[in-house]
Amino acid sequence: MNAAEWVAELKRKSQIESFKEQKGLVYDDHIEKVLYSGSVNGTLLVIEGNSCSGKTELLYHLASNVLLRSSQELVLIVSSEWDWSIKRLTFILHERLISSRGVSQTCKCNCAVKLENESTVHLQNAAREDGTDEDINSNSVNDVSLSSGETMLQFPEHEEQHECNREMEQLYESASSTVYPCSFWEDAERKIDAQCAILWPMEFSGVVESIPQSTKDLLRIWKEAKIQMHEDFRCNKTEFNEACFDASSSRLGCILMDGLSTFYWQLRLERGYTQVYADLQNRLCTSSKLFGCPVVCTNWLLNNKQHLPIQCKRFRSERRANARFYLENCVSKLGETFYLSVKGVQTKTEMASPYSQQEMEKV
């Protein structure tokens, strides 16, 4: 064995070990265990379901898994439904960072405090409008007699109470408008800013152009995404950092497309629309093979369109309650129910249909 063959063999072994290590890390998560089990690069993974069935919520957790796994993996997100929330992704990553670093208590910073105070002020305003405020109702009419020209503010005891209520209202308003980010929230924002690129295409042609076919193409898409995500990139004329695309340091972890069937009825009226979807599938599969990353799409309409030439591995998402949703493999008829909490994602395997075990094995 000469030196060139020896180096090639070492490189091949290191790639196999890194691939096994990556697969081991991926399979530690219950959601990725269902999605990525048995799939290879170049396979299009599609999560189907009705509106508000938890499809986008799944993508939030898949993106958080990549961001937590390594600081060298990038996430490309294409949201053609325009409802992708950066704040929601930051909140999920914020909670995952807290649980991964061994913090037992829930962090009460930022939007958690803001939402809590806003709900308190909203309840107080509603009670005041309905006349059910405890402070007002506690003052009985029999205790004091008011003349026609007097008001409650003219009495010393009621004046002190009114001033106290005013101070409390000012405190609630200041607390609801003030944001106190913690270190976990800042880390989540920093990770999303450095490792995520989010695009909101307005036309189907923009969706096709958002799928990279080379490293140079990925650099162009990443720069366009940063222009859409940050106004400072345009206003302050800050230079784009191309060092993150160094092949030796970073790699594309996954491509997430929210809304595969958004432009279906727009394309349905055009000639050759089936070929357009076939070209989109080819671009997605090519990107998966080129960058060695999974491609996950959401879809709510194309599951019954058998005439479309889209070959993919299908899953069904169904929301059962506010804190859990159901993910089913459409081929094996087996599913898992995921419970979302502050500690992360918990799962409970169960049958997806009332078939017997023998019938399930035949499938």
Swiss-Prot record:
Record-level Gene Ontology MF annotations: ATP hydrolysis activity
InterPro entries: P-loop_NTPase
A cellular-component GO term for this protein: cytosol
GO biological process: double-strand break repair via homologous recombination; mitotic recombination; reciprocal meiotic recombination; recombinational repair
Subcellular localization(s) per the UniProt record: Cytoplasm; Nucleus
Main location, first listed in the record: cytoplasm
Keywords: Cytoplasm, DNA damage, DNA recombination, DNA repair, Meiosis, Nucleus
Assembly and interaction partners: Interacts with rdl1 and sws1.
Main function: Required for normal levels of meiotic recombination. Acts in the recombinational pathway of double-strand break (DSB) repair together with rhp51, rhp55 and rad22. Required for the full extent of DNA recombination and cell survival under condition of a replication fork collapse.
Family: Belongs to the RecA family. RAD51 subfamily.
Protein name in UniProt: DNA repair protein rlp1
Gene encoding the protein: rlp1
